Amino acid sequence: MENKTVIPHAKGLKGTIKVPGDKSISHRAVMFGALAKGTTTVEGFLPGADCLSTISCFQKLGVSIEQAEERVTVKGKGWDGLREPSDILDVGNSGTTTRLILGILSTLPFHSVIIGDESIGKRPMKRVTEPLKSMGAQIDGRDHGNLTPLSIRGGQLKGIDFHSPVASAQMKSAILLAGLRAEGKTSVTEPAKTRDHTERMLEAFGVNIEKDGLTVSIEGGQMLTGQHVVVPGDISSAAFFLVAGAMVPHSRITLTNVGINPTRAGILEVLKQMGATLAMENERVQGGEPVADLTIETSVLQGVEIGGDIIPRLIDEIPIIAVLATQASGRTVIKDAEELKVKETNRIDTVVSELTKLGASIHATDDGMIIEGPTPLKGGVTVSSHGDHRIGMAMAIAALLAEKPVTVEGTEAIAVSYPSFFDHLDRLKSE
């Protein structure tokens, strides 16, 4: 286990950072390139552990993929070019890889087995495996196909009209990918809008998709064609430095080339509601995704209530929003966020336990948390990432305002999504 001691830094963070490529888009660029006919090139790929797991799985399925840091070349031969793997497909810590590849494997006329790390082994897969089974796939595993390892025997599927009980982009994506090879039409209706990278990118790869409110539909039998994909910066990674810039005194941080897809940009709305001085410049569309440069300055912050339809648009940012709330005046209530319980950790419990160690006034609720602020954060303690990249980074940012140094345990988890996180933090401290 790697540990990192973070020295408080209330003198201000200054500088310009280019955050790593978007994790969601990096996964999909490799997957869709593997399903397409022709060559797909990817620029700005995130070479984090999760996305490397996706590359490894598709290489085992017989796809030629070359990766050199942020550039990837996928030589796709279409769906029929995928081959039965001679080895188990190891998804590592990646929930995205697991759920999306389930949709793909369900259509293929061979047997495959998925395993992952200890965290993946606790994450519920029935939300994906049940609709795929109803389409005709054979999937088995622990807890009646709810937990990895999972065994999949795919084949000819039938389209489905699925009403999702939870707002999950991974579930929606898995069913749509299965629908691409199913007989007839497949539709997914969500309870709330979730990230739409799958729909945007499938269209860029030549697939026709129908959208009607909260329903997305796809006709079976469509082919993908190789593309050139430029991956924008990940707003979920940018969120850590947006929060640091807003709450560390005397700070001004610019983050360039950040994806601001409205289905992901809830963090920007919350920052503005809390009173952050946030500027968005050089707005443009890049590969079908809206992108901008974001500049944040130290701000006087107010507590807010966060819940309802915005939650799927900032679910991954809640750990760092909780850190921000400790420095805002008044009460911040985060609700309707039960989905936090089935992330890499139960993020309601891990956020509350670790921020409590730092002296924050925070307590858990059934569907979120309540934070009172502003509170000085004490140091001289050890906090844990619990093996969760977003908890590790959130604690490192909180430590910047602590009264004494803070040791963060398990910082190797951060490499899942932001391998250069501490390098970027050191650069902002030194400028």
From Swiss-Prot:
Ligand binding (3-phosphoshikimate): K23, S24, R28, S168, Q170, D316, K343
Q: Does the keyword Kinase apply?
A: no
A Pfam family: EPSP_synthase
- MF annotations from Gene Ontology: 3-phosphoshikimate 1-carboxyvinyltransferase activity
One GO BP on record is: amino acid biosynthetic process
Major location (coarse): cytoplasm
Q: Fetch the CDD domains from UniProt.
A: EPSP_synthase (cd01556)
Q: Name one GO cellular component term.
A: cytoplasm
Q: Pathway membership of this protein?
A: Metabolic intermediate biosynthesis; chorismate biosynthesis; chorismate from D-erythrose 4-phosphate and phosphoenolpyruvate: step 6/7
Catalysed reactions, semicolon-separated? 3-phosphoshikimate + phosphoenolpyruvate = 5-O-(1-carboxyvinyl)-3-phosphoshikimate + phosphate
Among its keywords, does the record have Heme?
Answer: no
The protein's superkingdom reads Bacteria
Q: Where in the cell is it found?
A: Cytoplasm
Q: Where does phosphoenolpyruvate bind?
A: K23, G95, R123, Q170, R347, R390
Keywords tagged on the record: Amino-acid biosynthesis, Aromatic amino acid biosynthesis, Cytoplasm, Transferase
The Enzyme Commission number assigned here is 2.5.1.19
InterPro entries noted in UniProt: Enolpyruvate_Tfrase_dom (IPR001986), Enolpyruvate_Tfrase_sf (IPR036968), EPSP_synthase (IPR006264), EPSP_synthase_CS (IPR023193), RNA3'P_cycl/enolpyr_Trfase_a/b (IPR013792)
Query: What are the catalytic residues?
Result: D316 (proton acceptor)
Which family does the record assign?
Belongs to the EPSP synthase family.
Quaternary structure, per UniProt, is: Monomer.
Function, as annotated:
Catalyzes the transfer of the enolpyruvyl moiety of phosphoenolpyruvate (PEP) to the 5-hydroxyl of shikimate-3-phosphate (S3P) to produce enolpyruvyl shikimate-3-phosphate and inorganic phosphate.
Question: Which PANTHER family does the annotation name?
Answer: AROM/DEHYDROQUINATE SYNTHASE, PENTAFUNCTIONAL AROM POLYPEPTIDE
Q: Which HAMAP family match?
A: EPSP_synth
The name of this protein is: 3-phosphoshikimate 1-carboxyvinyltransferase 1
